[in-house]
Amino acid sequence: MSFSRVNTSSATLTKNRTEESISSRSGMCVTCIDGCIGMCEIGKSAYRGHEVIYPQPFGVITVAAEKEYPVDYSHFNIMGTVVGAHGIDADSDKAIFPAVNIEVTIGHDKGLKFHLPWLISGIGSTNIAKNNWEGLAIGSALAGTALTIGENVVGMDPEVLFKKGEISNTVDLKRRVKLYRDYQTNGYGAIVVQANVEDSRLKVHEYAIQELGVECVEIKWGQGAKDIGGEVKIKDLKKAQMLQDRGYIVLPDPYDPNVIKAFERGAFKEFERHSRVGMVSEESFAETVQGLREAGAKYIFLKTGAYRPADLARAVAFSSKYKIDLLTVDSAGGGTGMSPWRMMNEWGVPPVELHSLLYQYAKKLASKKKYLPAIAVNGGFSFEDQIFKALAMGSPFVKMVGMARAPIAAAMVGKTIGQTIEAQQIPVYIERFGNSKEEIFVTASSLREKLGDKEFEKLPTGAIGLYTYYERLAQGLRQLMAGSRKFSLEHISRGDIAALTGEAAHISGIKYIMDVDAEEAEKILKI
């Protein structure tokens, strides 16, 4: 049995000729015929080469792997009970699901507070991020949860001003921070600025802290979609040259006269901008953390990807030793705005396995009374049941879940609906709910009451879409928690989920469902 689909995918806009008869190992048609125009990935690579490495079309899509891992979070079920309540009086009139508290506080001083136990954990310099930032920033701020400005935002900004080799002013980063802050209320939420190798060389964190007043900064080791640096596509020659001047790897060389001629005659239409891979050492990590604290950072986060177990151990150990405030662990499979497609599917430690190792490592340090940061886990999460399972799997160390593709989808849908309302071309599927923001978006009336008429009318529908999606997740999570009789997040435990297979139990250490409550059941039956 193969876990992977090879040589054909909607991600690369490729397909087989004999779609019903495929060789499972190569992904090739069982009869590869002379004269075929080459619609499969091999065939398309014969004429477009490296372009076919990446999902397409760039700039209007987000992407995640389609590989089916042997074990995933669907291999666990949530346990409910009829007895008692944790975090509230065991009273049927009090222990109702709207009373469930899903707020979370993190940070060395518990100074970061969020209405919801999830965050958007890195939206960077891709077009899909920039074009939907308004909805993502405002929606996140209104919901009172965190949003991370990802890597390369400053480096990609053509309007950045430099003075003596250091940033003196930005347009895009400043805009992104301001959009969030303008809608942040009562101190809930946080805007986080992330930095990779190139960002560090440009001193993005120092600028964000000292000039924009950003309190939360994140060191980026990697992400789940790839084990190389971030990349985007560039359609403008001058911008490609600018990025190379700023220290990025740009392919092909935008200053090569032959490349320029080929680009101008349309032989290719996009350059690739790549970031460098980091070189982690404890010494350099310690220096970076110390430098950020001296620059004025109040909270320091670390994000790591689906690297081998030793690197996960480094992330946990360094976060403990150097008092990091939040460690985010992103697992294999994506998502991304642009990453190599085969890499996304075939590298890294999958979610359940990575999160299980994370729990083991955190528990080991906790048993030694070592400091542990709050932990967030990523892994293709999109719904409340997955959030519950992830919090339970990593309890008591995992405090939040990181997401990106699902919130972007909600913001994009909200934006698109707004455009159809303005154009008076609402699709039938949507029109059955109404023909205005107030009728279509179920949270519109509460948002109008919260913001007032004037501010509500200015609210982008992308933000309403994200806020409404979050409202659904919040109610769904409260219902699941009430069913497990856990009325605040700190009461969720590993015993609140059960493994449906022996393999899932073996990997995670979560009890197999037939072994759950075995001793307690035996005692109850002694009547």
Whereabouts are the PLM-identified features?
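Cysteine-cluster motifs in flexible loop/terminal segments that predominantly coordinate metals
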Residues: 20-51, 368, 412-414, 419, ...
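Glycine-rich phosphate/ribose-binding loops and adjacent secondary-structure elements
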Residues: 263-449
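Conserved, well-structured core domains of diverse proteins
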Residues: 1-116, 128-141, 146, 158-189, ...
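Flexible, glycine/charged-enriched surface loops at secondary-structure junctions
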Residues: 150, 299-303, 368, 484-492
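Conserved, mostly hydrophobic/aromatic
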Residues: 120, 140, 327, 390, ...
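Active-site-facing alpha/beta catalytic cores
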Residues: 122, 127-319
